[in-house]
């Protein structure tokens, strides 16, 4: 763990009346916020021979190592931190000027370079020139079970149950799943110029059909610690995400200049979202993987005397920022039955996307209420590197906890109702 002191963005808090941006009902007071964020724009995590075999064109180079956060990705995250500071000032949670009080803001990050740097960039945007510690587990060379208890052996998947659940969501089989998405696969083949690829030309010489789904059959693989898909589905998810990362990185010709409108982006990223729908949002997977984060979120949102937790943070606190991965957002969505699509953003779990949990207190009776939302930069905001503020905000989608039995006039779920939903979603064997 280290304290950082980063002069990144000047903190300009406009003197805007609180009522313009805070809750319309003045009897509600914001008391605590938990933000679970995907890391920012990164380089691809791998460069495989298969990636080259499916296109005649060379893949562009990146300015950082595989899987690392790019400097531009850090800037985009800092913009989100800057926006959140303005919003939290408007809602009365943070002061307009100066650094947050000691312990008022806590940041936890997974051990990867891209997540640690995301925590630093968010801190730089939220509180420039302030020493804020980015906490990780002590051993940064090993996976952190907070973000994946399966990978670390805390708990195991039930192979038969998970297989049945995923195949049911797929429509009966993975072949059915790919069959219903041929339009999107054809669009990917067009962007790749797949007919001129080594893989396709080789198949044609052998009088074999040249399509991604036939050349690369997909198979579901379930083990005690992971679920995955092989073949065209897995490849398509990775490649379409890479195209989006190219666009967000500001590269001159994402997808070799062959992606030109929002319809094409939505069609391509539907393949990425579809894989996440199967592998990360299926409740039989999501509930296990999300349990440690659910426990942490519940602890952070529940009023109680301050207690020091793992990572050295004291909870509850005003703001808890957790820098993780797209899988974490999808797992939490699947476990809590939160569903969303993002206007202007084809990726349902985009770089820098934030699943935000807020606890509000009703002043008339001190009752506690939970609001959940998804805050995200649109693809155009990423492309243009648009600075964010209350006047130029990121996208935001308010989410509904389907199982909540008690709501207030603003649609928030009671803290008791939220706690019950979390307790029913979590898998005790996967707790830390």
UniProtKB/Swiss-Prot annotation:
Consequence of substituting residue 41 to A:
Retains 70% of wild-type activity with phytate as substrate
The UniProt pH dependence field says: Optimum pH is 4.5 for phytase activity. Optimum pH is 2.5 for acid phosphatase activity. Optimum pH is 2.5-3.0 for acid phosphatase activity.
- Name the GO cellular-component terms: outer membrane-bounded periplasmic space
Question: Disulfide bonds, which pairs?
Answer: 99-130, 155-430, 200-210, 404-413
Q: Which cellular compartments is it found in?
A: Periplasm
- Catalysed transformations (reactions): 1D-myo-inositol hexakisphosphate + H2O = 1D-myo-inositol 1,2,3,4,5-pentakisphosphate + phosphate; 1D-myo-inositol 1,2,3,4,5-pentakisphosphate + H2O = 1D-myo-inositol 2,3,4,5-tetrakisphosphate + phosphate; 1D-myo-inositol 2,3,4,5-tetrakisphosphate + H2O = 1D-myo-inositol 2,4,5-triphosphate + phosphate; 1D-myo-inositol 2,4,5-triphosphate + H2O = 1D-myo-inositol 2,5-bisphosphate + phosphate
User: What does UniProt note on temperature dependence for this protein?
Assistant: Optimum temperature is 55 degrees Celsius for phytase activity. Optimum temperature is 60 degrees Celsius for phytase activity.
Disulfide bond is among the record's keywords: yes
- How does this protein get used in biotech settings? The properties of the phytase including the low pH optimum, protease resistance and high activity, demonstrate that the enzyme is a good candidate for industrial production as a feed enzyme and is therefore of potential commercial interest.
| EC assignment | 3.1.3.-, 3.6.1.-
Provide the activity regulation entry from the record: Contains three consecutive and one non-consecutive disulfide bonds and shows a strong dependence on DsbC for its full activity. Competitively inhibited by tartaric acid and by sodium fluorid.
A single GO BP term for this record reads: cellular response to anoxia
Q: What is the effect of changing residue 46 to A/G?
A: Retains 40% of wild-type activity with phytate as substrate
User: Where mainly found?
Assistant: periplasm
Any idea which UniProt keywords this protein has? Disulfide bond, Hydrolase, Periplasm, Signal
User: What does changing residue 413 to S do?
Assistant: Retains less than 10% of wild-type activity
Mutation: residue 99 to S; reported impact is: Retains less than 10% of wild-type activity
Q: So what does mutating residue 43 to G actually do? A: Retains 70% of wild-type activity with phytate as substrate
* Effect noted on mutating residue 85 to A: Does not affect activity with pNPP as substrate
Subunit text: Monomer.
By sequence similarity, the record places it as follows: Belongs to the histidine acid phosphatase family.
Q: What NCBIfam families does the record point to?
A: PRK10172.1 (NF007552)
Give a short account of what the protein does.
Catalyzes the hydrolysis of phytate (or myo-inositol hexakisphosphate, an indigestible organic form of phosphorus that is found in many plant tissues) to myo-inositol and inorganic phosphate. Dephosphorylates phytate in a stereospecific way by sequential removal of phosphate groups to produce myo-inositol 2-monophosphate. Also shows phosphoanhydride phosphatase activity and hydrolyzes the distal phosphoryl residues of GTP, the 5'-beta-phosphoryl residue of the regulatory nucleotide ppGpp and tripolyphosphates.
Q: What is this protein called?
A: Phytase AppA
């Amino acid at each position: 763990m280290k304290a950082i002191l980063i002069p990144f963005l000047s903190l300009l808090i406009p003197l805007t009346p609180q009522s313009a941006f805070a809750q319309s009902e003045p009897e509600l007071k914001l008391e605590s916020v938990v933000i679970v964020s995907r890391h920012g724009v990164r380089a691809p995590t791998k460069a495989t021979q298969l990636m080259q075999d499916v296109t005649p064109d060379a893949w562009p180079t990146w300015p950082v190592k595989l899987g690392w956060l790019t400097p531009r990705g850090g800037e985009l995250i800092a913009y989100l931190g800057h926006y959140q500071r303005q919003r939290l000032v408007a809602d009365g949670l943070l002061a307009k000027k100066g650094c947050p009080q000691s312990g008022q803001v806590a940041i936890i990050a997974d051990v990867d370079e891209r997540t640690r740097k995301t925590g630093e960039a968010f801190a730089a945007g939220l509180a420039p020139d302030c020493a804020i510690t980015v906490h990780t587990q002590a051993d940064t060379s090993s996976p952190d079970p907070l973000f994946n208890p399966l990978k670390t052996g805390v708990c195991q998947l039930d192979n038969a149950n998970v297989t049945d659940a995923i195949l049911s969501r797929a429509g009966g089989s993975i072949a059915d799943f790919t069959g219903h998405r041929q339009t999107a696969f054809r669009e990917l083949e067009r962007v790749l110029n797949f007919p001129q690829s080594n893989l396709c030309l080789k198949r044609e010489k052998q009088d074999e059909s040249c399509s991604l789904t036939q050349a690369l059959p997909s198979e579901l693989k379930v083990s005690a610690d992971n679920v995955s898909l092989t073949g065209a589905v897995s490849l398509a998810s990775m490649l379409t995400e890479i195209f989006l990362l190219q666009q967000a990185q500001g590269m001159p010709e994402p997808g070799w200049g062959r992606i030109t409108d929002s319809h094409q982006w939505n069609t391509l990223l539907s393949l990425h979202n579809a894989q996440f729908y199967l592998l990360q949002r299926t409740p039989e997977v999501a509930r296990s993987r999300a349990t440690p984060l659910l426990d942490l979120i519940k602890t952070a949102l529940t009023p109680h005397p301050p207690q020091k937790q793992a990572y050295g943070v004291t909870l509850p606190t005003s703001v808890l920022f957790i820098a993780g991965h797209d899988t974490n957002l999808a797992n939490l969505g699947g476990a809590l039955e939160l569903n969303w699509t993002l206007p202007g953003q084809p990726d349902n779990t985009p770089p820098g996307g934030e699943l935000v949990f807020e606890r509000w207190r009703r002043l008339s009776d001190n009752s506690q209420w939970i609001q959940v939302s998804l805050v995200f930069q649109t693809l155009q905001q990423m492309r243009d590197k648009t600075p964010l503020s209350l006047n130029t905000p990121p996208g935001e989608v308010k989410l509904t906890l389907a199982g909540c039995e008690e709501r207030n006039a603003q649609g928030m779920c009671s803290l008791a109702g939220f706690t019950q939903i979390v307790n029913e979603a979590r898998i005790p064997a996967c707790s830390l």
